[in-house]
Amino acid sequence: MGISKKQVVLGTVVAVAGLAVFANQPHDVSAASKEKTVTVGLVGDSDRQLWEYVKKDAAKNYGIDIKLKLFTDYIKPNQALVDKSIDLNAFQTINYFDVQNKNFKGKLVSVGKTYVTPIRIYSDNHKTLADLPKGGTIVVPNDPSNEKRALDVLEAAGLIKYNHDVKLPSAQDITENKKDFKIKEVASDQAASALKSADAAVVNTNYALDAKLDIDKALYVEPVNKANKGYINIIAARKGTQNKKIYKQVVKAYQTESTKKHMKQLYGSAEIAAWDIKLK
């Protein structure tokens, strides 16, 4: 049976209409691509170097495109997480997270451990703790969680004692200071540069690495034990998103033997993988 001209025209109209409908559909490919993208907030370039390897592993093993967003301080990454400008962040200790999460009314959730970095006391002018002069200046971070940690380190090193009844102590809570050290409080990211005008400084490891401080020449190293388990670093997500499969896959991509290997290559003894660490 032959096909009439009318049938040909009708078939053409239907085909064109079908194409038009298809063209107006959402781009499923790009939508799927967006769903496989995770933006992770970091602080400092030293962490970025390790996450570049994690990024490759996540792409290879899970098809995830990790975007890295760098911050220069410890305040903005949690705000960015709450504001939804990033999906995860990986920069803070458990103790710092607990303090910040109260400020953000419980909107943050820990989704996995990363590493622990024993912080150290550094000096450009002295080789041992005993060399620190009476009345000398020691720099510590000024945000509550990191200042408490710095005071713990100074106390463990035998330089001061402070009132442990205070939940978030500052230099004002020091109760014993036999060498009359002047404790100077500065922003965490300024502690390393403050060494130029101070006798010593307690510097967070990521900032110490960024400043190219020699960790092997530190005057004192914070002990890694159960008492300091709150200083393990974590990956955080927004509350309500923590069970997303893709976020769990990012954590899995981080917590691998490959990451341990790269961590050792990049940082030596400065960082210790913490997801399977056994503290005594």
Regions found by a protein language model. Give the residues of each.
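Short, well-ordered beta-strand elements
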Residues: K34-D45, I64-L70, T137-I138
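Short, polar/charged alpha-helical segment
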Residues: G44-K67, K76, A80
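Periplasmic-binding protein-like
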Residues: N146-E155, A253-W275
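A bilobed periplasmic-binding-protein/Venus flytrap-type ligand-binding module shared by bacterial periplasmic
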Residues: P118-L129, Y231-K244
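A conserved helix-loop-strand patch within extracytoplasmic ligand-binding domains
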Residues: V111-I160, K260
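Sec-dependent N-terminal signal peptides of Gram-positive bacterial secreted proteins and lipoproteins
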Residues: M1-D28
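Short helices/loops that flank or line small-molecule/ion binding pockets
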Residues: D57, I75-D87, D152-V153, Q172-V203, ...
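Ligand-binding "clamshell"
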Residues: V99-V111, N125-H126, V202, D210-P223
